[in-house]
Amino acid sequence: MKRDKKEQVVQEVAEKIGRSQGIYLTEYQGLNVAKMAELRNEFRKAGIEYKVVKNTLVKQALLQLAQADKLADGLKSTTAVAFGYDDPIAPAKIIRKFSKTNEALKFKMAAIDGIVYGDDKLVMLSEMLSKTENIGRTAGLINNVVSSVPMVVNAVMRNLVSVLDQVAKQKQ
């Protein structure tokens, strides 16, 4: 690859890293072309970009963004990078699911919001709720609270009426 092409790739990778909410490094050695295409399709369906890039070029892109020290340990052997633009957790779910049936795919590490997660954290990351799921749960909790307030007020009023009715009966 010529120098100007390498510089272009470094710029593209740096731009993708800058836009990403989550960056995942995987080792794909041993995956055949069909399995790699299947994995890319899974990522594509979720709006995730998955690229095979030379380790040195990824490292140069990380240096431009002052993040090389965080992910440099994962840049060994064959590396492919998953860029999670909208949901930083979605790549972890796909990697975990795919690696259950394809042992050749290995999770190396991830960086989400500046925090680096090692290869032992894939299960934890994949079990986390996505941003959309968290918003949905929060909205559901708020809705439950709002809908239960009138019921509580009605119960208090019903109890008060019952007490007043019993007091009135005792006075008769």
From Swiss-Prot:
GO terms for biological process: translation. Part of the ribosomal stalk of the 50S ribosomal subunit. The N-terminus interacts with L11 and the large rRNA to form the base of the stalk. The C-terminus forms an elongated spine to which L12 dimers bind in a sequential fashion forming a multimeric L10(L12)X complex. Signal peptide: none annotated. Keywords: Ribonucleoprotein, Ribosomal protein, RNA-binding, rRNA-binding. It comes from Chlorobium limicola (strain DSM 245 / NBRC 103803 / 6330). It comes from the Bacteria. InterPro entries: Ribosomal_uL10, Ribosomal_uL10-like_sf, Ribosomal_uL10_bac, Ribosomal_uL10_bac_type, Ribosomal_uL10_CS_bac. Belongs to the universal ribosomal protein uL10 family. GO terms for molecular function: large ribosomal subunit rRNA binding; structural constituent of ribosome. HAMAP family: Ribosomal_uL10. Transmembrane segments: none annotated. This is Large ribosomal subunit protein uL10. One of its GO terms (cellular component) is large ribosomal subunit. Forms part of the ribosomal stalk, playing a central role in the interaction of the ribosome with GTP-bound translation factors.
